């Protein structure tokens, strides 16, 4: 029961996003609600929605703001959170995740969005989209709320692969700088390498080797290398791009999200303790709402797979409608900016002194 035929991503003058409706913990209802939320903020966006048509069809039909903007692609099977990536690589055809990535591969959509199993999504993305020339190990980049003027830092890798040698980390620096340059409109991003301390003698041998490579590539990569970073620098002003391996980055990301929720819970308990506290909460309601919005991890939901022949945004599996809308909003911004083409150009020119493509349509991230 597709509402209409989705436009081709290439040459149609419209932004088309491919969405896996079935992979999240909250089911397709949260995904469809997220699509609707993002659609209202992005009137030029259209969607190819992949999943069980019997489930998602009625949900989409009930939403007037999605009429004429969605095409449903029936996919009878679902990749679960317990499925192994190796199994999905061999037997994933027919799943909503596979179908979602296939739309990007076929040129029907510019960016894919999924709340599904991270390992499986990376595996499917790698075998269907393939890596960009010269990329050894793709990475997942996320936006981290920070004290910088733009409000965000970029951190990668946050979970694509637990391993990363010195050459991988140096390539992450190039990709992260390109993302910050085009996604955050930073002409010369500041890049740092996450370590257990800022002193030169600290850290594993591969980090010291990576530091030499990242520093040597700074001029060609059009970024400024600021040296080693500590965990406290992740939300700070010292850098714009934090480079690390996927294990460390994922632990840091989940710790940050848990801390944000803990602070929110503490504030709720403190202002609900007694009558005076509740009166104070009423007086400070506007400020509290602004604070809650700023530290709400749902509003910066969405990790970007870098280094592939296509753009994929990974939403948290537990994302609600707000989180899904944020991830789709990020996908729309990346599609509108032509980010994939610019990243490919940056990597292709990494051995030369070339620059990214002009930033003629790049918008800084905004919260949805």
Curated annotation (Swiss-Prot):
Record-level GO cellular component terms: cytoplasm
Keyword Lipid biosynthesis recorded: yes
Sorted UniProt keywords: Cytoplasm, Lipid biosynthesis, Lipid metabolism, Phospholipid biosynthesis, Phospholipid metabolism, Transferase
Record GO terms (molecular function): phosphate:acyl-[acyl carrier protein] acyltransferase activity
EC number: 2.3.1.274
InterPro entries per record: FA_synthesis, Phospholipid_synth_PlsX-like
One GO term of the biological process aspect: phospholipid biosynthetic process
Pfam families xrefs: FA_synthesis (PF02504)
Disulfide bonds: none
SUPFAM superfamilies (alphabetical): Isocitrate/Isopropylmalate dehydrogenase-like
Catalytic function, reaction form: a fatty acyl-[ACP] + phosphate = an acyl phosphate + holo-[ACP]
Cellular location(s): Cytoplasm
EC category name: transferase
Highest taxon in the source lineage: Bacteria
Pathway: Lipid metabolism; phospholipid metabolism
UniProt xrefs under PANTHER family: FATTY ACID/PHOSPHOLIPID SYNTHESIS PROTEIN PLSX, PHOSPHATE ACYLTRANSFERASE
Protein family per UniProt: Belongs to the PlsX family.
Free-text function comment from the UniProt entry: Catalyzes the reversible formation of acyl-phosphate (acyl-PO(4)) from acyl-[acyl-carrier-protein] (acyl-ACP). This enzyme utilizes acyl-ACP as fatty acyl donor, but not acyl-CoA.
Quaternary structure and interacting proteins, as annotated: Homodimer. Probably interacts with PlsY.
Protein name per Swiss-Prot or TrEMBL: Phosphate acyltransferase
Native species: Cereibacter sphaeroides (strain ATCC 17025 / ATH 2.4.3) (Rhodobacter sphaeroides)
Protein encoded by which gene: plsX
